[in-house]
């Protein structure tokens, strides 16, 4: 499997650069924090658009589920498999964040504001294994589920070999790191 260099994806540094290591779905907290960072610099501080670049790294835990499209959330009953709150099961998983208030903290909206997202391939494979076991997918091999998950990544999400390496790569490009 070939993985891209993240440098061109991140683009030229901005005045402010923040990396968010997101490990859990956690009510969409990681995506909400990214939105808050954009709002703080662009609106509250009045610096305007383009002064902040963010990178969200979805790795380990359950956060990898945020990278998948709505059809995949439904097909694999991800909210149920993750035992998310009952209200999350009823919510629309708008662009990968079942807890987003509208679409202001969705991956689609954040990428439009200049965010880059990286999904850990190791986490995709681990998540495929967990889904297969949790949902009793005895006729669906783990490798096939992992391939389907990789194919279901949202636009703006780039697959990387390992999230922990992506975090280091982003920090080497002078992004401050925030664990969410």
Model-predicted segments: where are they?
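Secreted/extracellular ectodomain signature
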Residues: 1-180
């Amino acid at each position: 499997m070939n993985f891209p260099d993240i440098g061109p994806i991140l683009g030229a540094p901005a005045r402010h650069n923040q990396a968010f290591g997101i490990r859990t779905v956690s009510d969409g907290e990681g995506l909400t924090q990214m939105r808050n960072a954009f709002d703080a610099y662009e609106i509250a501080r009045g610096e305007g658009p383009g002064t902040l670049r963010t990178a969200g790294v979805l790795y380990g835990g359950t956060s990898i589920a945020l990278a998948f499209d709505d059809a995949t959330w439904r097909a694999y009953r991800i909210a149920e498999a993750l035992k998310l709150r009952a209200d999350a099961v009823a919510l629309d998983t708008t662009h990968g964040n079942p807890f987003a208030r509208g679409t202001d903290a969705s991956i689609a909206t954040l990428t439009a504001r200049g965010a880059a997202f990286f999904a850990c391939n190791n986490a995709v494979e681990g998540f495929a294994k967990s889904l297969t076991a949790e949902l009793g997918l005895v006729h669906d091999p783990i490798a096939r589920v992992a391939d389907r998950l990789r194919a279901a990544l949202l636009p703006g999400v780039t697959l990387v070999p390992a999230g922990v390496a992506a975090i280091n790569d982003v920090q080497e490009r002078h992004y401050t790191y925030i664990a969410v």
